[in-house]
Amino acid sequence: MGFGWQGSVSIAFTALAFVVMAADWVGPDVTFTVLLAFLTAFDGQIVTVAKAAAGYGNTGLLTVIFLYWVAEGITQTGGLELIMNFVLGRSRSVHWALARSMFPVMCLSAFLNNTPCVTFMIPILISWGRRCGVPIKKLLIPLSYASVLGGTCTSIGTSTNLVIVGLQDARYTKAKQLDQAKFQIFDIAPYGVPYALWGFVFILLTQAFLLPGNSSRYAKDLLIAVRVLPSSSVAKKKLKDSGLLQQSGFSVSGIYRDGKYLSKPDPNWVLEPNDILYAAGEFDVVEFVGEEFGLGLVNADAETSAERPFTTGEESVFTPTGGAPYQKLVQATIAPTSDLIGRTVREVSWQGRFGLIPVAIQRGNGREDGRLNDVVLAAGDVLILDTTPFYDEEREDSKNNFAGKVRAVKDGAAKEFVVGVKVKKSSEVVNKTVSAAGLRGIPGLFVLSVDRADGSSVEASDYLYKIQPDDTIWIATDIGAVGFLAKFPGLELVQQEQVDKTGTSILYRHLVQAAVSHKGPIVGKTVRDVRFRTLYNAAVVAVHREGARVPLKVQDIVLQGGDVLLISCHTNWADEHRHDKSFVLLQPVPDSSPPKRSRMVIGVLLATGMVLTQIVGGLKSREYIHLWPAAVLTSALMLLTGCMNADQARKAIYWDVYLTIAAAFGVSAALEGTGVAASFANGIISIGKNLHSDGAALIAIYIATAMLSELLTNNAAGAIMYPIAAIAGDALKISPKETSVAIMLGASAGFINPFSYQCNLMVYAAGNYSVREFAIIGAPFQIWLMIVAGFILCYMKEWHQVWIVSWICTAGIVLLPALYFLLPTKVQLRIDAFFDRVAQTLNPKLIIERRNSIRRQASRTGSDGTGSSDSPRALGVPKVITA
C-alpha cells in the first residue's frame, strides 16, 4: 500500500474504533471524538488540528442541527398528528394498512428529518393500528424503513444526505468545480424515488411471512387462569353480556367454581366474584383484557387456595392473587440439562431456589389435562413466572436450569394514574365507541368508565356505547402513556379549568411527578383543603397510590405519604420547589407539553415556506438562500410566534449525532491525508476498469457504504466513505453527483441491525421487537435493495425509463389485492395454498399459528354465534398447562 506509518496508525485505530462500536461497548459519539483526538496527537503528521476541527462548522452538519428545531416546532403544534390521522383513515387488512401508513411517511420524510417523523408517528400508528385491528409489529418496522426510504428522495430528506452535500460543497469549492457538483433539492430524486418505491413494494409483497406480528414475542397460545375480582366489571354479569367473548385473540375455554370445572361454559352463565376463568390466547392479549375487565392472574401458589374461600380484600388488577403484587413477569425455557425435568411443579421449591412462582406453562402438540402443580416438567417447556423480591437472574441455579436468557414479559412496577378527560363538542371521537376512537389497546392505557353528561355512568365493558359530547372518560394510565393522552385531539383534562387558572402559558406548561413526603404538611388533607392551586400555582391532574386505585375525583383525595401526584405546572416549577418539605422527589414527565394547536397553521406554513425556498432555487438552478440560514430563520420565527419555547428547541437537538458526524469528518480527513482513502479507492477503480463499467464501481461504493452503515451510524459511514468514493469517481471520470448518490443510498441502508440507525432503535423499543425479528425482514430487504440499487446505478442516464417502470409496478402491487377478489374462488384457494407453502418454508411456525388463530376465531363464533364451543381441545392450542 502507498502510505507510511501515518496511514498504518490511522487504519489500525480506525479499525479498533469500528470493533468498539460494533460491539456496542462505547457510543459512536464518544468513540469518534476520542479517535479524532488521538489522530491529532502526532504534531499534525496524521491530521492537523484545523482540519480535525473543520467538521464542527460544516454547513451540512449545521443544517442538520437546525432542521431538528424546525421539526420540533411543527411537532409541538400538533399539526403533523392531525394531518396524519386524516390521511391514515381506516383499514382492515395489513396490506392496505401498510400502504396507507408507509406512503404518507415516505412523502413527509422527504422534506423533514426522518428522526422527528418517526418520533411523532410511533404513538399515532400504535393507536391507529389498534383501532384498525392490525398488529403493531406489522407497522413499526415499516415505519422506520419508510422514513429512511422517503429521505433518499431529496437532498434534505436525511441528515446523511445533508452531510454528503456539505462534504461535496467543501471539496469541489476548493477545486473550483462546484457548478457541476452542487446539489439542488431534487437532484437525488431521479434515483432515490425508484429506490424508495421498490423498497415499498418489497414490504407489501413479503409482509405476510417476513414481518413479525403474527404472534406475540412471548409464549403463544397460553391457557391462563384469571380470577374475577370483587371489583371486576364482569362480576354478576352473564358471560355473553360481559364483553369478554368479543375480545380479539382472547377466548374463555373453561370456568372453575366451588371445586368444579366447566369446560364448555354456557353464554348465559352468570360470573361471580372469585370465579376462575381459563383464558386462551397470547399473554399480552390476556393481560390487556385482564386490565380492562378487572381480572386477577392466578399463579401456582394461589392455585392451592382455589378450594378454600377467597378473601375479598383489595387486590390489584391483573397481578397474581394470593400474594403481594408482582414486580414483573418473566418467561423462561426449561434447559435439556435441567434437574427440574421429570419433577412436578409442586415438588420444586420455586421461591427458595429461583425467587419465582409459575403462572403458566406452554408445551407443544396439544394440551394435557391436569392442574399446574401436578404437571411433570419436560425439556423445552416454556414457563411464565411471577417474580418475588428474592428473584435474581444471575443466580447460578437459574443459569443451569433455564435455556438462554430469562426475558421480562411485564413490568408490574409502573405507576398507574387515574386521569379524567372530557370530550369536546367538536371532537372526532363523538359518536364512536371507545375502540373506534382509538382509546383501547394503547400500551399502558386502560379505559375504566365513562361518566355521561346527564350524571349516569357507563362501564368500560360496554363495547357498544358511543361517546357523546361532554362525556368524561376515566382512564388508568402509566406515565409513559400520559404524553399520548395529553396530545389526543378532541379531549381535555377534567382538571383543565384548574390548570388554566394557574395562569401558566401553554407554551411553558408540562407535567411533573411529585412524591408526597410522609411528614409533609399536606399529608392527611384533601387536595381541595390544601388549596393546591393557590398555594403552589399548579394543578393536580391525577394521583398514584401504591397498591390501590384512588377515587376518581382528584379534589376529594386525602393525600398520604408516598402518594405520587401528577401535576400540571410551569417548566421551572420543579426547580423552584426542589427543597419544598411537602415533596421528597420531583421528576418532569418527558414529552408532556400540551400541543399548541392555535399555532398549527403558522408552524406548517413556516416549514412549507422553508422547503419552497429550496424547491424554487432548485428549479431556477440558483441558490436564493442556503438551507442552513433558512432553517435558522424558520426556527426563530417559530420561537417568536409561540410554536415552541427555547427549552424545547434546545432539547430537540441530538447532540450525540452532532458529535458523531463532526468527529467522523475529521477522521475521514485523516484517512484522505495519509493516503489510506486513495489506497481503498484504487480497489474501486480497479473494479470499474476491469469490468469496463462505471456502474460496477458505483455498485461497489454502494455495497461498501451499506455494509459500513450496519456497523456504524449512517452518518459516520457516509463521512468515512466519501473521500474514498470521491477519489475513485474522479479517477474514473464519474460525475461527482452520481458518486455521491451511491453513498447517500448506501449510507441510509441500515436495515438489518436495529442499532445501526436511530429510527430503527426507536421502533425496536416501541414495538418490543427482538434482534432476530429485525434480521428476518432486514437481511432480505438489504439484499433486495442492493439489487435495486445496482440497476439504478447502472442506468443512471436512463432514469426516465426507470421511473416509469417503478411507478407502474408499484401501482400494480398496491392494487393487487383488489384484483385478487375478482378471481374465481378456486384460483384464490390455489394462490392461498402457494403463499402458505412459501410462508411455511420461510417460517414453519407461522402456518401453525395462523391455523390456531382461525380455530380460536371459529370457536368464539360457534354455531350459536356466542362462543359456546370454546374448550381447550377446540382451541387447537399447543399443550398448555396452567392453574
UniProtKB/Swiss-Prot annotation:
It is a multi-pass membrane protein. The keyword rRNA-binding does not apply. InterPro entries: Cit_transptr-like_dom (IPR004680), DASS-Related_Transporters (IPR051679), RCK_C (IPR006037), RCK_C_sf (IPR036721). Its main location: membrane. GO terms for cellular component: plasma membrane. It is found in: Cell membrane. One of its GO terms (biological process) is potassium ion transport. Keywords: Cell membrane, Membrane, Repeat, Stress response, Sulfate transport, Symport, Transmembrane, Transmembrane helix, Transport. Induction: Up-regulated by sulfur deprivation. Disruption phenotype: No effect on sulfate uptake, due to the redundancy with SLT1 and SULTR2. Slt1 and slt2, as well as slt1 and sultr2 double mutants show a 50% decline in uptake while the slt1, slt2 and sultr2 triple mutant exhibits no increase in sulfate uptake capacity when deprived of sulfur. Modified regulation of the SLT3 gene that becomes up-regulated by sulfur deprivation instead of down-regulated as in wild-type. GO terms for molecular function: monoatomic cation transmembrane transporter activity; sulfate transmembrane transporter activity; symporter activity. Belongs to the divalent anion:Na+ symporter (DASS) superfamily. Na+/sulfate symporter (TC 2.A.47.4) family. Na(+)/sulfate cotransporter with a probable high-affinity for sulfate and a proteasome dependent turnover. This is Sodium/sulfate cotransporter 2. It comes from Chlamydomonas reinhardtii. The lineage of its organism: Eukaryota, Viridiplantae, Chlorophyta, core chlorophytes, Chlorophyceae.
